[in-house]
Amino acid sequence: MKRMIRKYGPPIFHCINDFGQGSLAALIPFFIANFGLNYYQSATIIFCNTVVASIAQPILGYVADRWRVPWFIPVGFTVTLVSISAMAMATSYEMILALSLLAGVGAALFHPEAALLVNRTQSHEIGNAMGRFAVGGSAGFALGPLLAGGVYVFGGQFLWVFTIIALLGVLLYLYAFMGEGEADTDDTDIADAADTGNRESRAKVLSTGTNDWVSFGKLFFVIASRSILFSVLAIFIPILYITVINGEASASSLALTAYFA
């Protein structure tokens, strides 16, 4: 049982974390209705969350490489989801922005160490493991708006369900991964140590090459363009649904889920 949880734990945690990230855009119509926000203010909520997560992740990734910080994982997704829950108590636009920033910090804490957890515990099938990890995040993004849609039925206090999900995730992490120390590597990984050593040696040889900044620039442009388009659509799909199509705010969550899926 524990071995199974250790195998599927990282994608589950990724799903939990991205529940919060995906739900934020679905809450925009709720904020517009309750705080009278305009398009610029609505977009700024998502902008703050995304920028903080993007800037902080490389820094926290460096920290994760230098020091063993497995607690980044439960703390990260807990901060993300509790920040979303706390928006139920927000009394001003500035408070929403602050909580959006905090949710971004939580996401930045989670991702680097979670990726390292996959590598440490499942390096013998790293391709499949990272595939499951990515699917978990995509599922969280897609299901987050559906979960957040409950706010339009039950009111803002429904957001505290995100905190309950975070607590369940923490319990799962404590059961499967805490107290393992350096022994968190699977037996199969130990058997594959020689092959891993060969891969590391090969990586060292390849790392002596020169940086291809032209190719890097092209790749950066493609990734940045995709991310900009993704974020813009995530922000304005629910807004356009309630303003142009005159749809119900609760149904805008379904439109966002269809987009994320």
Regions found by a protein language model. Give the residues of each.
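Helix-breaking motifs and short loop linkers at transmembrane-helix boundaries and internal kinks
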Residues: 36, 68, 89-94, 123
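Residue-level signature of mid-helix packing/kink "hotspots" within the transmembrane helices
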Residues: 22, 50-58, 141-142, 260
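Juxtamembrane intracellular "pre-TM" segments in multi-pass secondary transporters
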Residues: 1, 181-221
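Extracytoplasmic gate region of multi-pass secondary transporters
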Residues: 24-25, 215-257
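Symmetry-related core transmembrane helices of the 12-TM Major Facilitator Superfamily/SLC fold
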Residues: 159-176
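Paired small-residue
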Residues: 83, 94-102
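Conserved MFS/SLC helix-loop-helix module at the cytosolic interface between two early adjacent transmembrane helices
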Residues: 55-91
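Cytoplasmic helix-loop-helix junction between adjacent transmembrane helices
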Residues: 99-136
